[in-house]
Amino acid sequence: MREFNNIIYPDISKSPQLNLKAHYSYSCHTPDDDSTGTKFKGMILYDLAILYLTNLPAIAHISLLLSNISYQATEALLKLYDQSKLLNKQVFLAFDKARSYSPDANQLLSENTVLRLSSDGNELYGISWNKGENSDEV
């Protein structure tokens, strides 16, 4: 996890630490930082380490995990996600607000997009589940 952390935070940010306490117990934390973004970063780096170091064929992440992580770090993560294909592995990523990122990040996203969902006809299964009249039913 430290190697990945050093890639996404080259300015020497503390990396998460995994402590195996027993065969049924562990902790994963970043020393001196328990913010939401740091916790999400720790989970992402753990997932990437497992993806890169084991036979696990794929991981899936949602945009919520990236929402509290800096743009620079997110763009570095996108590159790490992309490099996983060199290992014949896949990353499934639900990503929104792509326009907020650099042209390079958007190019990387475009090259790797398999499915793009949006309103007005690009909904999964062709319909938006949240449209319709409100009901008083509970």
List the predicted regions and their residue ranges.
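Extended helical coiled-coil dimerization/tether regions that scaffold
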Residues: 1-34, 105
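Alpha-helix C-terminal capping segments
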Residues: 18, 49-54, 81-85
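Flexible loop/turn segments at secondary-structure boundaries
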Residues: 34-36, 67-68, 99-102
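GG-anchored amphipathic helix commonly corresponding to the ABC/SMC/Rad50 NBD signature/C-loop
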Residues: 37-58
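Amphipathic coiled-coil/heptad-repeat helices and related helical stalk/stem segments
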Residues: 43-44, 74-77
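Walker B catalytic acidic pair
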Residues: 62-64
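Conserved ATPase-coupling elements of RecA-like P-loop NTPase cores
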Residues: 68-74
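C-terminal lobe/lid and adjacent interdomain/linker elements of RecA-like ASCE P-loop ATPase modules
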Residues: 77-138
